[in-house]
UniProtKB/Swiss-Prot annotation:
GO terms for cellular component: chromosome; nucleolus. This is Meiosis-specific protein ASY3. PANTHER family: MEIOSIS-SPECIFIC PROTEIN ASY3. It is found in: Chromosome; Nucleus. Residues 7-19, 72-86, 131-142, 209-219 have a biased composition (Polar residues). It comes from Arabidopsis thaliana. InterPro entries: ASY3-like, ASY3-like_CC. The keyword Nucleus applies. Its main location: nucleus. Residues 322-341 have a biased composition (Basic residues). GO terms for biological process: meiotic cell cycle; regulation of synaptonemal complex assembly.
Length: 793
């Protein structure tokens, strides 16, 4: 949470419910002189109202979108819409998305009624954000002569540079200096208002780094149209056209009686207030186009610059939610159509013819064309362009003196500039210049010719804000497109000497440019007016982006002295004014033209306006002569580039031929070497093959001899075997005969034996029988003897 939160914040829930009045800006500008105006007595009471309204604003931000829309409709009916300079900026930045639709509707309604609102108070016709934008931070108090160069007090601080917004690093230093001036006892009432405004800026830079769309970043329509309107206001102006001065810059933004009728119910109050008051201021500007004055103040609907402002607003909104970004983009288209319908028939037919002759380009380029056409129409209403040029110069000096950041601040803010690339792929929407803790600077849509990237600009200003330009495409890829070559951007030092300063300054940067990107080509476009050789972009277009990128570019920007940048700033402002310049801006397809972007005005301010007043009296013919001289110089550069390319191509062809010859010779050497090696290998293989074949033949011969010998041996062995078998057979037959003989003999022997045995057995039997008989006879005798013996007993 930021240290700069108001008392009516989330930490104080007991505070009142806040209104949805986004009255960050007031209708009239705070006076820069030391003499308080008659309305300065209201400051104290208004500041008290602002503090009380802060509580209501912070609490209503927590509610849902439905409640927020309801409160917006209710707050549209409140006459006094006050906001606090101490409030949190979370609500105001979300409500800027539909500003262009309101402005477009107001423009359409006022297209045929210029000068009808003269009766309204001028304070109610100032854009709602004008005074807040126009308050410089570094120098809240200046003498009347320094600020407006003799113009009336009531139209002070309405220069576009008052709407500038320094980077975050520069902001902190200027806020610190502002605080020191707050402590001075003799500080005037408008100094208090400046303190409040600077405090709000500091809150915007610290409190919401993610959701802020910087309120101080004046939409280009407000910047440029306010700048144009100041041409028609002077010390002798009609009192009805002079805005009623009010030192409080953030209070009286809803006092106009037309605000209630012109506010759409669905739009935020801030955007509605900006639209209504911008329409009124533009009407007054149209009614006083012929008047002379000493300073130019842009109105929201100035015919020269209003359309670009709307386009730039859409470009400057990439940090908003996607829904609002898409809505803003659609609104931008409506605004372009509204302004295109107001063009006269000649300009319209010329634009249609040029569009039919040119291939389709990006939407941003078409937007730039419409813007330049609208610029041309605006210049037709400008009856005194050269007097405007004189009236413009004092404001430039004062604005640059007020808003130039110190070199240390630029160096501190530079590392953060590269973070500004839009990541949603929408090249028509660029980050707004937001005051937050890590400042994300708006990127320069112009592609740097040196490095091929989109260089960020160090500070938003009317001369370097990322607006739609008719002179350069917005959808430039990191690599150069085939159909759209980038615009050659180099600084021009335009002094009273004319073309000498610019040529010297250009030639001083040229070697570095050619060294870095030699193949860079100038952008040449066809034009129905062949007399116009050069188009110098006016500060309200996207060329100011490329101007800002030159100061921040590592190669081109930081080598420029403050005097060069001061004179270059004067060149930017002056190139916007003359009818020939406006005509050149509307002719986007000029034959033989080179589009150059002057350097950024964000440089060291000039304290005195005498040099600018002297330079503002230079004739427009000198400007055209300078343009032609620079165009011729650019053509010479283009021819030199063509010669360099042809020489490079010739040298490249020679190198390629020599290299190809060397490659051919080396190839032949390699081929012969390969053939030699292959022959050696083939011969060696043949020799080895022959040797192997010889050995194989010898082995075959030996095998054949062995085979023959084997056959002989086998036959011999077979014969031996046969003879042996025959012998065996003979022996067997002989054995059989002998065996047969032995058998016969044996049989005879056995028969003889059997006959002898039988005889022997018969004899033995007979002997046994005889023995037995003898034994029985003896037994009988014994028995008889024994018997006799027994009888005798």
């Amino acid at each position: 949470m930021s240290d700069y939160r108001s008392f009516g914040s989330n930490y104080h829930p007991s505070s009142q419910s806040r209104k949805i009045s986004i009255g960050v800006m007031a209708d009239s500008q705070p006076k820069r002189n030391l003499v308080p105006d008659k309305d300065d007595g209201d400051v104290i009471a208004r500041v008290e109202k602002l503090k009380s309204a802060t509580v209501t604003e912070l609490q209503a931000n927590k509610k849902e979108k439905s409640d927020l829309a309801a409160k917006q409709r209710n707050s549209a009916q409140v006459t006094g819409h006050v906001t606090s300079p101490w409030r949190s900026p979370r609500s105001s930045h979300r409500k800027l998305g539909t500003l262009e639709s309101v402005l477009c509707k107001q423009t359409s309604s006022l297209s045929g009624s210029k000068g009808l609102n003269k009766g309204l108070n001028g304070a109610h016709q100032t854009p709602a954000r004008e005074s807040f934008q126009n308050c410089p931070i570094s120098s809240p108090q200046h003498s009347l002569g320094e600020l407006n160069g003799g113009r009336n007090d009531r139209v002070m601080d309405r220069s576009p540079e008052r709407m500038e917004e320094p980077p975050s690093a520069v902001l902190q230093q200027k806020v610190a200096s502002q605080r020191e001036k707050m402590d001075k006892p003799g500080k005037e009432t408008n100094g208090t208002t400046d303190v409040l405004r600077s405090k709000l800026w500091e809150i915007l830079g610290k409190a919401s780094p993610a959701n802020n769309e910087d309120v101080n970043s004046e939409t280009p329509e407000v910047e440029k149209t306010n700048f144009k309107l100041s041409q028609d206001k002077g010390s002798n102006d009609d009192p009805l056209i002079k805005p009623r001065h009010n030192s409080d810059s953030i209070e009286t933004d809803s006092e106009s009686p037309e605000n209630a009728t012109r506010r759409p119910v669905t739009r935020s109050l801030l955007q509605r207030r900006v639209g209504a008051k911008g329409v009124q201021k533009k009407t007054k500007a149209g009614a006083n186009l012929g008047r002379k004055c000493t300073e130019q103040v842009n109105s929201v609907f100035s015919f020269e610059e209003g359309l670009r402002g709307k386009i730039g607003t859409a470009v400057n909104s990439s940090v908003m939610p996607k829904k609002q970004r898409g809505r803003r983009k659609n609104t931008v288209v409506k605004c372009r159509k509204a302004h295109s319908r107001k063009k006269d028939e000649a300009d319209w037919s010329r634009k249609e013819a040029s569009k039919s002759n040119t291939p389709p380009r990006s939407e941003s380029t078409e937007t730039g064309k419409r813007s330049s056409s609208s610029d041309k129409k605006g210049s037709s209403h400008d009856l005194h362009p050269q007097s405007k040029a004189r009236k413009q110069k004092p404001d430039i000096s004062t604005r640059e003196g007020d808003f130039h950041p110190s070199p240390e601040a630029e160096a501190a803010a530079l590392p953060e500039m590269s973070q500004g690339l839009s990541k949603n792929g929408d090249k028509h929407e660029r980050p707004s210049n937001i005051f937050r803790e890590k400042s994300v600077e708006p990127e320069n849509e112009f592609q740097s010719p040196t490095f091929g990237y989109k260089a960020p600009i160090s500070s938003p200003s009317p001369c370097c804000s990322p607006e739609a330009s008719p002179l350069q495409p917005r959808n430039i890829s990191p690599t150069l497109d085939e159909t759209e070559t980038p615009i050659f951007s180099f600084g021009t030092k335009k002094t009273s000497q004319g073309t000498t300063g610019q040529a010297s300054d250009t030639e001083k940067r040229l070697p570095d440019f050619l060294e870095k990107k030699r193949d860079y080509s100038f952008r040449r476009e066809s034009s129905p007016e062949p007399n116009e050789d050069l188009v110098l972009s006016d500060p309200s277009s996207d060329e100011r982006d490329s101007d800002g990128s030159r100061e921040d570019s590592p190669v081109l920007g930081h080598n420029i002295s403050p005097e060069e940048r001061e004179t270059a700033n004067w060149t930017n402002e002056r190139s916007m004014l003359g009818p020939s310049s406006v005509k050149r801006n509307s002719n986007l397809k000029g034959i033989g033209r080179v589009v150059l972007s002057p350097p950024s005005p964000l440089s060291k301010g000039i304290d005195k306006t005498d040099s600018f007043q002297h330079c503002s009296e230079m004739d427009e013919d000198e400007d055209e002569g300078l343009g032609r001289a620079v165009a011729l110089f650019a053509m010479a550069l283009q021819n030199f580039e063509r010669k360099l390319k042809s020489a490079a191509e010739k040298k490249s062809s020679e190198i390629i031929a020599s290299v190809s010859e060397e490659i051919h010779l080396e190839l032949e050497n390699i081929k012969s070497h390969i053939i030699t090696e292959a022959g050696k290998t083939s011969n060696l293989a043949k020799t080895k093959r022959k040797h192997a074949e010889t050995r194989l033949q010898e082995q075959e011969e030996k095998m054949r001899m062995i085979h023959e010998k084997f056959k002989d041996d086998v036959s011999h062995h077979l014969e031996d075997f046969k003879s042996t078998i025959e012998e065996l057979e003979a022996n067997q037959s002989e054995l059989k005969g002998s065996i047969k003989k032995q058998r016969t003999s044996h049989q005879k022997l056995i028969a003889h034996f059997e006959g002898g045995i039988e005889t022997k057995l018969d004899d033995a039997t007979k002997r046994i029988d005889s023995v037995n008989k003898s034994a029985r006879g003896k037994m009988l005798q014994l028995k008889m003897i024994v018997a006799e013996c027994l009888r005798d007993d």
